[in-house]
């Protein structure tokens, strides 16, 4: 009796290129390459693709990219946070106020700022879960509250919309070395924020593809009812995100 496997001629074997193009990350990579080629070809200075030019635009892109990592995780889970951008400014403003007005060590101020940001995120998640309103609406309200508070508090406490004197705070030099220093590639200086961006991208990729929590994130974005039926802690995952 033959044990040779049977084949179904109706099933067409997909090529490597077809399989690759079906992956969403490949589409994103091709889009990034296309944009890079477009800007390089239209750059009249000729510096865009050279080290000085790359250092310039990655200095701008890195902080945005770091925020985008967190936003991307939330979007994969089927939610959206409109307040993430202003939350960055609010946290930085809070840290600046603590060190300039209260003379606090900058590391303690950073910890307080992160705890404050986590609390706002918790409130957003709690409101979304309990009001059943779209996260877009909840975080839009948070956006306006934080933006108004930023202007009001800085004007009341400093008389302007800027906070100065942070460089005099205790712990400033060590914090600057970790978060605001530079490193060299060839003869060109790059901001350390670029290294943080790459590191956090790798960490987020590992989280999504190699951990149970990453599976929960994908499950929420796919079908929340099926995810709940499969045992995914929906409320817990949304609050954490």
Residue ranges and their predicted role:
Residues 136-211, 239-240:
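Transmembrane helix-bundle core of multi-pass membrane transporters
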Residues 105, 109-113, 119-124, 128, ...:
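Helix-loop-helix "hairpin" substructures at the membrane interface of multi-pass membrane proteins
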Residues 30-41, 69-70, 90, 94, ...:
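Generic alpha-helical transmembrane segments of integral inner-membrane proteins
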Residues 33-43, 50-102, 106, 126-133:
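Single transmembrane alpha-helix segments in multi-pass membrane proteins
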Residues 25-30, 57, 65, 86-90, ...:
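Hydrophobic alpha-helical transmembrane segments
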Residues 1-30:
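Transmembrane alpha-helical segments of polytopic membrane transport and secretion proteins
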